[in-house]
Amino acid sequence: FNPCPYSDDTVKMIILTEQNKKQDFYTLDTIGEHNQFNKLTAKSQVVFIVWQTGIGDAITARAASGLAMLVDKYQMAPVASDIKLCNAGCYCRPTAIQFAWEHKCVGIRCSDPGVPTDGLSGRPHYGETLHKVRSYNGK
């Protein structure tokens, strides 16, 4: 697990739970300080986590260590090698999100939801990726 050497303390996560397929936005700091992760996992299993960073931003070592702690504590699968973490400003594929759901992986990181495509290949953006997740879950 190699965190990017940049500074951004506003890392957000989307937590999808098997129980209600609900999407919740938190920061790693919020989860750590307010113990919200324990509350979320008390009644439903966390399946995977999506990090959202803005264009040109990246996770901090603090956020990375926090995520690693959550993965270890709740025995979630590590990031699958054939998914790989996206670099800041790139776009995650819906197939990667589906793979993560199936294998209960964490650590799929996507770019700014306000940008429709990467401008080059027209790959789907963050919002569309999440739409695929909702569709995949029968919603």
Swiss-Prot record:
It catalyses: a 1,2-diacyl-sn-glycero-3-phosphocholine + H2O = a 1-acyl-sn-glycero-3-phosphocholine + a fatty acid + H(+). Has a highly toxic phospholipase A2 activity. Expressed by the venom gland. The keyword Secreted applies. GO terms for cellular component: extracellular region. It is an enzyme of class 3 (hydrolase). Keywords: Hydrolase, Lipid degradation, Lipid metabolism, Secreted, Toxin. This is Orientotoxin-2. It comes from Vespa orientalis (Oriental hornet). It is found in: Secreted. One of its GO terms (molecular function) is toxin activity. Its EC number is 3.1.1.4. One of its GO terms (biological process) is lipid catabolic process.
